[in-house]
């Protein structure tokens, strides 16, 4: 088992970041997380999808005190988000000094780039389907 191999302990999840392009089943997941008293933080469209169902969710903008910019190109790329994902228990003093709250889980999927290519969309539209934040979230959470 991976947890045994890497001497990893099971940890309770207190806070999750959700940022998805494909929102299928995301409301069910958010409802389940909320029922477990897990704080949910989310981006733009995902935030709208979850909040309109009456599920308690906090926007990334509320944490960063900074709006999505550049037509939504920059949402999660912020030290208060990535610091919360990358922080280790040993970083707690640094996190506290900079008001960074830890994330215990990240739920993310990527823009449908392959689908856009197969539809033959124009280059400008295709460039907009190149995901930057999603892969960054996935890499940070893996680390």
Each language-model region and where it sits:
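Glycine-centered flexibility sites
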Residues: 25, 44-45, 83-84, 133-134
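Short glycine- and Lys/Arg-enriched binding-loop motifs that mark or flank ligand-binding interfaces
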Residues: 40-41, 79, 129-130
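Glycine-rich nucleotide/cofactor/substrate-binding loop typically near the N-terminus or early
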Residues: 45-113
